[in-house]
Amino acid sequence: MNKRVYISADYDEGSGDRNVVEELNKWSTDNYHKVDFVDMAKVVSGSVSENSDCRKCDLKSEFNSQINASSAVIFVIGDKTASRTAGSGCERMYKEWFLCNCAPYKHNSSGLKTCKHMNTSPSDPNGDFDYINSCSYLRHEFEQAKKRRKKIIVVYNSLYKRESWLPSYMCEYKDVAVPFWVYDSCGNKVGNYQFIKKQLGYE
């Protein structure tokens, strides 16, 4: 049975962790690895971002929906993950809507606009992580997965454990986070499919 798994990673062109995401996505296109991966880049490039007035909060709301529909979330940790701030900066939690300005998502070029949330309410303690927040996209995804009690799998984009790469909000996972890359019996660098498979309950 295929499982839907959400991938959260740093997609920076020059120093991100796309190589891990590409390896994971390869597993979902063959007849051997029965996993349906949904990576953040696909969500960002989807219909919600095509709206000319798409804001950070709209993307976070869509991330919530995609995570809710997934059975597990894989967080790919690279050497720049802890310092990434994309998605942060919203001030709506502290100011009235007419005092807050934000830019539509970067695919659009409409410039700064006044916040569109005139009214807000406390988030449901049993519901989603509030999409109106000052978190980065990466932290938002983590908080949503944790609040929704999803299976969380943390891997380093490395052949070795890199605890210093973990963002502070993920410190509780330092003992269970593992390197994504391993050497096979022929000395080739490959993704640790056996670990991912076990974490997803396939054995």
Language-model-detected regions and their locations in the chain:
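A short helix->loop->beta-strand "cap" motif at the edges of active sites that frequently abuts
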Residues: 147-152
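C-terminal interaction surface of TIR/SEFIR-family domains
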Residues: 4, 156-203
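Flexible loop residues that form catalytic
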Residues: 78-79, 158
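Short catalytic/ligand-binding loop motif for oxyanion handling, primarily in non-cytosolic enzymes
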Residues: 14-17, 82-86, 161-167
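Winged helix-turn-helix DNA-binding recognition segment
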Residues: 136
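Hydrophobic/aromatic ligand-binding patch that stacks against planar heteroaromatic rings
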Residues: 66, 141-144
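Conserved BB-loop
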Residues: 31-62, 79-91, 98-116, 123-132
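Conserved N-terminal substructure of TIR/SEFIR domains
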Residues: 1-73, 77, 200-203
